[in-house]
Amino acid sequence: MAKKDKHDDALARNRRASFNYFIGETYEAGIQLTGTEIKSVRLGQITIGDAYITVRDQQAFLNNANISPYKQGNQFNVDPLRRRKLLLHKKEILALDRAVSKEGKTIVPLRVYIVKGFAKILIAIGTGKKNYDKRQTIKERDLKRELGKNLKNFH
């Protein structure tokens, strides 16, 4: 049996990331969550569309990721948009910090998934696309779709 890719069972995806950024090197990081937050994440109640990562004092943080409050959490629920620490090796954090210090580079979250009971996030160093780059991406996507339709109709 073929080995299953661990990124296939993503609980949340940032589908706009590849449209808005040229994706470079990727890293897998753990997310420091409270008990009710991990329960919400396992239920798929997380949104990373507007999220971004910052590096400060040799620590990486996930900002603006929305984890909905757990229904049975009551007083243990925390702010859904709070800043969450990312668990990375020191060398990885320094590499991210060096990359972001260059003009036009940012760290974008790509997807959230569970590995052996722990919440993980796939992050990447991205370079922002200009509007003409985005239009080129749309043209390529439409051309690929049209080619697929033509091949389907040909058979």
Curated annotation (Swiss-Prot):
InterPro entries: SmpB (IPR023620), SsrA-bd_prot (IPR000037), SsrA-bd_prot_CS (IPR020081). It comes from the Bacteria. It is found in: Cytoplasm. Keywords: Cytoplasm, RNA-binding. Gene3D superfamilies: 2.40.280.10. GO terms for biological process: trans-translation. GO terms for cellular component: cytosol. One of its GO terms (molecular function) is RNA binding. NCBIfam families: PRK05422.1, smpB. HAMAP family: SmpB. Belongs to the SmpB family. Required for rescue of stalled ribosomes mediated by trans-translation. Binds to transfer-messenger RNA (tmRNA), required for stable association of tmRNA with ribosomes. tmRNA and SmpB together mimic tRNA shape, replacing the anticodon stem-loop with SmpB. tmRNA is encoded by the ssrA gene; the 2 termini fold to resemble tRNA(Ala) and it encodes a 'tag peptide', a short internal open reading frame. During trans-translation Ala-aminoacylated tmRNA acts like a tRNA, entering the A-site of stalled ribosomes, displacing the stalled mRNA. This is SsrA-binding protein.
